[in-house]
Amino acid sequence: MISVTELRNGTKVEMDGGLWECLEYSHLKMGRGGAKVVTKFRNMETGSIVDRTFNSGEKLQDIYVEGKKMQYLYRDGDDYVFMDMETFDQVHLPPALVGDTAKFMKENTEVEVAMYGDKALSITLPNQVILKIVQTDPGVRGDTVSGGTKPATLETGAVVQVPLFVEQGTDVKVDTRTGQYLSRA
């Protein structure tokens, strides 16, 4: 158990029958009466966000979330299949859990899966991945008045803005947090 005054960004707790991650917190001192802690929590299973206010003496049940290294193998129907890098067990995860990370995952990509017991909560990609451009228009010489970018479709289906000199078939580095082109690989 932890006191609500010990909450920090990223603290994971169990409350109201669900698993929650603290996104924001602030400690308010009142003129009369006790202090209050105003928080914003994200449900780790559904993704919903809730604002909660606690009295300073309240306690919450903290949880331990383990990060497991896994490798993305393939898609099986709607599910994504990952392999645990330690035990080599295969785990099927639904598209709702994988979410937008699928845009930058190709086969054999290593990811970190946040696990609580046997339940997968979220997937974290490496900060940068190298992907091949499968479709982009050729850059036109002299068309660089505004800095010059064009859309390019990656091998995973994601579309990123790349400089005009980048051609189809080129391997590029992409930041998975922002979805932006970084450099040629």
UniProtKB/Swiss-Prot annotation:
Cellular component terms (Gene Ontology): cytoplasm
GO biological process: peptide biosynthetic process
Organism whose genome encodes this protein: Deinococcus geothermalis (strain DSM 11300 / CIP 105573 / AG-3a)
Coiled-coil residue windows: none
Pfam family for this entry, one: EFP_N
Family that this chain belongs to: Belongs to the elongation factor P family.
Keyword NAD assigned: no
Alphabetized NCBIfam families for the sequence: efp, PRK00529.1
UniProt protein name: Elongation factor P
Pathway(s) per entry: Protein biosynthesis; polypeptide chain elongation
Function of the molecule: Involved in peptide bond synthesis. Stimulates efficient translation and peptide-bond synthesis on native or reconstituted 70S ribosomes in vitro. Probably functions indirectly by altering the affinity of the ribosome for aminoacyl-tRNA, thus increasing their reactivity as acceptors for peptidyl transferase.
The UniProt record lists the keyword Transcription: no
Domain of life: Bacteria
A GO MF label: translation elongation factor activity
Main location: cytoplasm
Signal sequence coordinates: none
Keyword terms of this UniProt record: Cytoplasm, Elongation factor, Protein biosynthesis
Subcellular location: Cytoplasm
